[in-house]
């Protein structure tokens, strides 16, 4: 028997080791990886905080539970206690082990769950904004109140756990005693039995529970700034004048009740306790009744007047939380009085009008430029570059390896040979080839480059599709890129990776559950494993507390490809701010820059005024760098992020209104304009475009992210909202309010105008015959001085699985003029060379012209030939026939 007991502890330790074996391996690998990326201090910040917290928490839990246990076995008046708990030392040893395990487990759970909130509490940074009810700085609600709430929940849960386990222990031991003594169980003596067993202990615990109910209502008071009971988010009239008063009374009464409970139960007097509990319950019920009465009999009939100051609080703090309080607002009086000189003065804006659209361009990239089946383009990025001395907006994408497409998909192919993507593709957004496809300035493998942008090392070891580990510098050469009938190979010369010593091979074999790490003869001592190669996951691994943009974008700099990810600080704890998408505060506080070859990752603070990112910087020393430390050539490519802009646009639709009375009436609500992608398709929310333009009153073109607003449930455009991003203008926002007494075409209304035009709709119908389909591109509405120029690219897609949309025409509209042209330049000439103020003469003549049947037959013939060539994969013939079709359509026009 003694031998069995002696074996228990070692056996238990072995079981624990096996249970936590994988965590130990992960911990060792994490240390190696964080050391490799030079963020080991960041990793140890968390580990150190957890360990430092665990020690005192473990001591508190262990001593509290042990003392509670000791206090129970001291009661010798109850025989069940002697039999069940105090018979021999073995029970004490067993409880000691149990207490140790439970205490260390609870300490770990608490520390690993709340270390972050404790560090935020200790490193709080003021917002210098006070809430209008309790006049506390916003930092209290974001950095301190969450910790109070967590402590409250944990302590209340533990106290209730003690009460429940005490009752369970009593009933188990009582049953054991009755069975051993062969006595009947008498439920009438339960009250006396529990008092004898744990009366004082339960008295103390009950008093503490009531004390923390008081603390809980104090937390409820502070949480009134998040109330959703009124007409706007935040504390309402009823919350302030009824709910708050009752909460304060409950706090005081429960505080007194906790003291009375402790004193009364110890003395055996239960009447005062019953009175205190009854009063507390009465007040809680009364609070709900009082709030209901105030809301329905005082506020409801005078809501607009009584709620105005609270609505104003909501407006002011929501605008501040979503960074809408610094928008420059201007009236945009549409005159449409452009002269030819104005066109000349805005030539750079017009030359950069985007006629290529995202989706068709990505399809074309993946049809024409993947080179081999295992390459892929994940998405299209838009940016601006100085190309051969000119400021150009471009589309570009990285050519990555899709390891899931490898055939055969062997371990060597996946992890040792096909280790990286290769190269990038770039085209200007403002031009297409004669076939209506993107006109490449960088393409092919090895890169064919018509620009001054150097791309000496185009390899992509880190990207959006690099989701698996690779091992480099092995005995097998890495595949670099295909070259005619052979393959070009490469040896990795970057500094990323963990050396594959025997110990590390063993660690990764266990971690990845793959014996190949040990069996492979291709792995050498100086081979390196590169893990966490997905750029977003790499950033999350280092800084999981940041929120990352859904669209990382690539930049070509210093002969290599770099990735930029926008990182946000968010919270749902900003007082009085209306939540959108589960958050009520957001800042684009950091840019993450990642080297696609070496994997170097840097976090640059781009919003020094954000208290949350400054709080993180105080906690994680060495994580963030200043924006000025980023290379100038990288900073020039920082974009205003579309995810942030989209959220701000949603909020602005309601919170452009500053007057509480107008806000209450809901009479001036906006929504982001709708758009239509197909001639007979459904509408969807317009995707805000990045546009190169010269803002009114500015003398230089810049890239602007622009959104169009309609009046809610109407199609008339009411405003233009733009975010600037070039140089010192980065982050500045501007709102142009359009005349409300005029019909201003939104993207959707513009599409309706196109569909209603006799001449254009006739041509669309001709193209949209069976076997082909007309698609709209991305609608652009370009402000030029006090005028609006509308642009709509038209794509023609042939039937067939692998058909590629071709940009065939551009529709331009200005004032009352609407033209269908082969290019932007031709359309501009057609509009501004016209003498009248309506549809140009050419279109008017066309409206009465009959179409030659022979030309229609010829058009059908060339179209059929093009479709046949496409099915056969003969793209040369396809292009020739489509060109002939275009010539016929032009002659009909």
Swiss-Prot record:
Protein name: UPF0182 protein CLB_0018
UniProt key word Ion transport: no
Keyword list, A-Z: Cell membrane, Membrane, Transmembrane, Transmembrane helix
Family of this protein: Belongs to the UPF0182 family.
Major localization class: membrane
UniProt xrefs under HAMAP family: UPF0182
Location in or out of the cell: Cell membrane
Annotated coiled-coil segments of the chain: none
TM ranges: 9-29, 49-69, 94-114, 154-174, 202-222, 246-266, 273-293
GO cellular component, one term: extracellular region
InterPro entries linked: UPF0182
Organism: Clostridium botulinum (strain ATCC 19397 / Type A)
Record's bilayer topology term: Multi-pass membrane protein
Protein transport recorded as keyword: no
